[in-house]
A protein has these predicted regions:
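Extracellular beta-strand solenoids
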Residues: 2-3, 9, 15, 21, ...
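Acidic (E/D-rich), amphipathic helical modules within compact regulatory domains
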Residues: 37-38
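Long terminal segments
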Residues: 76-176
Length: 176
């Protein structure tokens, strides 16, 4: 699909289709994409509540989410965000194909490619509902180091399920 001009969508988007927007994309809800071969090209900014992208992204502006941004980048399908990513929390899985963003502004940012970033993983554990990113509770330092050896697809699936429940974040941060 190609949309000329700004596009505003009331409610959530779940898609495995290609999308080209020649302007800004504003979704008054959540965005969930799940196709390795169908990219989203947005020639402007993207705004939504939560964003989980398994599709390659090319965004010439910024991503603005009041909640979570989860970008999964596979093989030869990298994602590029020319502007910044502004969200409460950011998960990026770019083990093979890079996700390039100009800057980030969030309470935490976790890159799955950095297995030693336990500080940001701990921040995520404190404010994200456990079901949203992991299917069990993580109680010790060794488990933190193992978190991204799990299936990222399953992790993204759990995030999508929590998006439907609108419960990505804990009511209040857990104690350290």
């Amino acid at each position: 699909k190609v949309h000329r001009g700004d596009l505003v969508v009331e409610g959530n988007i779940e898609s495995n289709q290609k999308l080209i927007v020649l302007g800004n994309l504003t979704v008054k809800g959540n965005i969930s994409t799940f196709s390795l071969s169908n990219p989203w090209v947005i020639l402007g900014n993207v705004t939504a509540t939560n964003i989980v992208a398994d599709s390659p992204l090319l965004i010439t502006g910024s991503i603005n989410a009041s909640g979570l941004v989860f970008i999964d980048s596979y093989y030869d399908n990298p994602s590029t965000i020319k502007g910044s990513i502004n969200a409460r929390g950011i998960f990026i899985n770019d083990i093979i194909a890079p996700v390039v963003a100009s800057s980030t502004n969030s309470e935490f940012m976790v890159r799955a490619s950095d297995k030693h970033d336990t500080e940001n993983v701990k921040k995520a554990l404190m404010i994200i509902n456990p079901d949203a990113y992991y299917w069990g509770l993580i109680n010790d330092e060794d488990a933190l180091k193992e978190i991204f050896k799990r299936s990222n697809i399953r992790m993204a699936g759990n995030v999508c399920n929590q998006m439907k429940k609108e419960a990505l974040f804990r009511p209040k941060p857990s104690p350290e």
